[in-house]
Regions:
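N-terminal polybasic phosphate/anion-binding patch
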Residues: 1-61
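Generic domain-boundary/flexible-linker signal
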Residues: 14, 76-77, 99
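Structural signal for conserved beta-strand scaffold positions within catalytic alpha/beta enzyme cores
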Residues: 31-33, 67, 100
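Glycine-rich phosphate-binding loop
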Residues: 55-89
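Activity-critical C-terminal alpha-helical subdomain
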Residues: 97-109
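Conserved small/polar residues in nucleotide/adenosyl-binding loops
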Residues: 114-116
Length: 116
């Protein structure tokens, strides 16, 4: 099985390799550079859009492609008003599935460095 990750980030590639190896044998995973179509620090729906774009744009000579994007989501009643979530999109050439990783809140001092 061939899997392409829409990123050259070694941590993302290794994470995808480990995940697919839990369910399939003989998995070959490679990363490619693609355009996410969103900013460097995506917000809200752009985080999901970036993951989907990465998955679709990296689908080439493979069984599955994976797009991973992280970014801030507005969430009321939190200290800063934002939670960072990671989004993964898996594409088989016909259908996309989406999953979210655990969210966390940046300390206010870190969030103050991000232009929201």
């Amino acid at each position: 099985m061939r899997v392409v990750v829409g990123s050259l980030n070694p941590t993302k590639i290794e994470g995808v390799r480990r995940a697919f190896n839990q369910f399939f044998d003989d998995v070959i995973v490679k990363g490619v550079e693609v355009n996410s179509g969103v900013g460097n620090q995506p917000f809200n729906n752009d985080v999901v859009k970036g993951a989907i774009n990465r998955a679709i744009n990296s689908f080439q000579d493979c069984d599955f492609s994976v797009g991973i994007e992280a970014g801030l989501f507005s969430l009321k009643k939190t200290l800063t008003g934002y939670i960072d979530f990671q989004v993964a999109a898996i594409y088989n050439g016909k259908r996309i599935t989406i999953g979210f990783g655990p969210g966390f809140e940046y300390p206010p001092v870190v969030l103050s460095l991000i232009h929201i």
